[in-house]
Amino acid sequence: MWMKIQRVKTVIYSVSLLVAASSLPIANAAEKLQTTLRVGTYFRAGHVPDGMVLAQGWVTYHGSHSGFRVWSDEQKAGNTPTVLLLSGQQDPRHHIQVRLEGEGWQPDTVSGRGAILRTAADNASFSVVVDGNQEVPADTWTLDFKACALAQEDT
């Protein structure tokens, strides 16, 4: 059972010399899911290597839970649940393929969407990284994902 779904949307800018950095904190109350996404600075158009970190995310929930899930409904690429295909805002033919990853995170093979982390810890972090070596044109990229805390499983 899923609970406390929170949606996070941010923009990744790729231009010849500059990429904007942003931080997007959402929610504050003790029993509410909190999500934060920080986009890295100075991402250049051109060659980007596999594994390059584009953003770092955090999910926090202080209530009873058995883990976290992060996914995107709109940007899923292919059959790998953790891989997303971002389209450029200036030119929708521009693409960059990214993946969600982090220590302990696994592809959610049950639903086929996103990454899941089984933990009772209140906090978890994940990264958005480049998936494969790519040549990326200058454009603006929107990263749109959802996060939730997983309900305690009945034993």
Language-model-derived ranges and their functions:
Residues 2-14:
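Bacterial N-terminal signal peptides that target proteins for export
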Residues 10, 38, 109, 119-122, ...:
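Generic alpha-helix detector with strongest preference for long hydrophobic helices that associate
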Residues 14, 43, 62, 95-96, ...:
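Compositionally biased, intrinsically disordered low-complexity regions enriched in proline and serine
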Residues 20, 24-25:
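N-terminal signal peptide c-region/cleavage motif recognized by signal peptidases
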Residues 26-90, 123-136, 140-142, 146-155:
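N-terminal small/polar-rich segments of proteins
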Residues 73-119:
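Mid-chain, structured segments of secreted extracytoplasmic proteins
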